Amino acid sequence: MVVGDLHGHMGAAEWLAARALDEPGTHVVALGDYADRGDRQLETLVILLTLMLELPGSFTLLRGNHETRSMASRYGLEDAVLSVHDRAVMDAVHVVFAQLPIAAHRADGVLCLHGGIPSGARTLEELSAVPKGEEEPLDGTAIEVLWNDAEERAGGHGPNWSRGVGRTFGLDASREFMERNGLWLLVRAHQPSAEGFVRLHGGRVVSVFSHPGYLGGATDGAVAIVGMDRTVEPMRIFLGDREAVAGSEPPL
């Protein structure tokens, strides 16, 4: 099970926790962006960190573009933490964020990451070599993995005008990287969609977003179920009334 952006949606995190605990044979990979923007940011983060500790080896948290000090300060997590805890707790959260991996590779050819294929890395080994420990990633490959957007077009990498950081990647970029590294599927997050699940690049790239009603919109949240038989299907997150999310800024 692969989980996209949650952005402080505690209901979706509780939904995920129930399934992770009830189905111990399922390996869960969460793709980052756990807080910021939602109204239950701290609670959502606590649920996810608890699952990571309670289910070692079967619940993996990756780093997204919001797991940095600057994003936490701008989009609300820092305020949420400091409203009930002191600065030392926020500093500890950033230590955890800085140690999260930026990608996860399943041996049968599945790659999971938050944003997208980087322009400066050609192999999985290069992704594995990206240094951890930086509160604000400075490595160009790390920045692109966290920030790149998928576009349904031919071609390779292009400028990311909408975000002003990272790049976009098209079919040629994903196909070249995936064929070189023996991958049949890339699962990534980062971009909201109406149904929370989008197939791109001939079905070899799946984009998943797990916050229902993001920014107050009439959108679903979903996770991706990736089978060992190379099936990939969405599972909708049904919670009844969607939680409203404060703010109207363009998604970052």
Describe each model-derived feature in a short phrase.
Residues M1-L252:
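Feature recognizes metal-dependent phosphohydrolase scaffolds
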